[in-house]
Amino acid sequence: MTQMEMARKGIVSEEMKKVAEYEGVDVEEVRQKIAEGRAVLPKNKLHRVSKPMIVGEGFSVKVNANIGTSQGFSSIEEEKEKARVAIEYGADSLMVLSTWGDLREIRRTIVEMSPVPVGSVPIYDSAVKSYQMKKNVVDFSEKDFFDMVIAHAEDGIDFMTIHVGVTRRVLERVKNSKRILKIVSRGGAIIAGWMIKNNRENPFYEHFDELLDIAKEYDITLSLGDGMRPGAVVDASDSQQFEELFVMGELVERAREKEVQVMLEGPGHVPLNEVEMNVKLMKKVGKGVPIFLLGPLPTDRAMGYDHIACAIGGALAGYYGADFLCYVTPSEHISLPDVEDVREGVIASKIAAVVADVARGNRKAWELEKRMALARKNFDWETMFDLSLGRDIAKKKYEERPYPDKGCSMCGPFCAIKIAEEFS
């Protein structure tokens, strides 16, 4: 049975117990939210996930870290290190988005080593296979769409981004739009190119029931990808974006009817004043479905510091109801990220998630904030470091410029906490 099937039958899985303990909530709340489709617990039947996560209404905001190879940079060892570092610094899940090398070996290696859920975008494999055969990247068959989904499922992938909302009607609207950047989703562009070349409807949309059957067999959580998401803040919140959203909203109901877990992916470039509207509209159209946002970035001028822009947008999005944040690294829009970029990206998005949790009144988040306050009051540096999202950096800076007494070298003998303690 799938996690949703079990939840609807009143059965509590081991994974449900684990996430309930982590969240500090009653397991019945976990079971009920999964049964209603307001939360998902990504867990392929073939993947041993020792650190499962629950994504959705009423639970802590989660962070995903993308890793994966590209042409000229296809070291499995580097990707393993990226995965290790991402998990060490708090990533709740990984997505393997490789486009070069032995894609299946890389994917299987990461799934095997990962204690957290692993996601992917199967359509990439179809395009890469065609390119490596010296063909056009969209020169593959309709059968390849589903063969790749099955291959990823067999490899233990827990959740998949499927750009099912890229329909002929949506595509026609985009072609005739005034968008500066027509399509920036790689998966969306591949499918759109295939549709135009073959003058056909999107197979994922046309044969959605077949996709659901595969997902149910392996208990894959479907993340309905927004292939028409805006690629610039000046293109945000246009009719093309919302046309696709409404298509995906209809498909959410069909997935729930088949007892397949489903999420909605949202835009990655959104002005700050439009974040609330976008998140709330997605929640409404998706009838409370978990929301997975790529960022979002509230400015496109932060190249080299996109992880900071991402944290700003992500914190606000999380506060307004986004459940799952995909990190952005300092290398976004510039190059393939290295291990250090992955670390910086995870920390930035974890900060955004924690900020949102505190603002939403998450009990566990508030307990941790209280522990930090008490540690600062007591000059308990080790506890402060342990509670910090950037523990290594915090400890390194403290040790580089030490102070021999209580407090730190910022204030020295003029420490406000120490003075207040002495004269109170």
Swiss-Prot record:
Keyword Iron belongs to the record: yes
One Gene Ontology term from the biological process aspect of the record: thiamine diphosphate biosynthetic process
Residues the entry annotates as binding Zn(2+): 269, 333
Pathway the protein contributes to: Cofactor biosynthesis; thiamine diphosphate biosynthesis
GO cellular component: a single term: cytosol
Cofactor note: Binds 1 [4Fe-4S] cluster per subunit. The cluster is coordinated with 3 cysteines and an exchangeable S-adenosyl-L-methionine.
Keyword Iron-sulfur: yes
GO molecular function annotations of the record: 4 iron, 4 sulfur cluster binding; carbon-carbon lyase activity; zinc ion binding
Keyword annotations: 4Fe-4S, Iron, Iron-sulfur, Lyase, Metal-binding, S-adenosyl-L-methionine, Thiamine biosynthesis, Zinc
InterPro entries, per database record: ThiC, ThiC/Bza_core_dom, ThiC/BzaA/B
Residues annotated as binding substrate: 66, 95, 124, 163, 185-187, 226-229, 265, 292
Catalysed reactions listed for this entry: 5-amino-1-(5-phospho-beta-D-ribosyl)imidazole + S-adenosyl-L-methionine = 4-amino-2-methyl-5-(phosphooxymethyl)pyrimidine + CO + 5'-deoxyadenosine + formate + L-methionine + 3 H(+)
EC code(s) of this entry: 4.1.99.17
Cofactor: [4Fe-4S] cluster
Enzyme class: lyase
Family: Belongs to the ThiC family.
PANTHER family, sorted: PHOSPHOMETHYLPYRIMIDINE SYNTHASE, CHLOROPLASTIC, THIAMINE BIOSYNTHESIS PROTEIN THIC
Protein purpose: Catalyzes the synthesis of the hydroxymethylpyrimidine phosphate (HMP-P) moiety of thiamine from aminoimidazole ribotide (AIR) in a radical S-adenosyl-L-methionine (SAM)-dependent reaction.
NCBIfam families linked: PRK13352.1 (NF009895), thiC (TIGR00190)
Protein name as catalogued: Phosphomethylpyrimidine synthase
Protein's organism: Thermotoga neapolitana (strain ATCC 49049 / DSM 4359 / NBRC 107923 / NS-E)
Gene: thiC
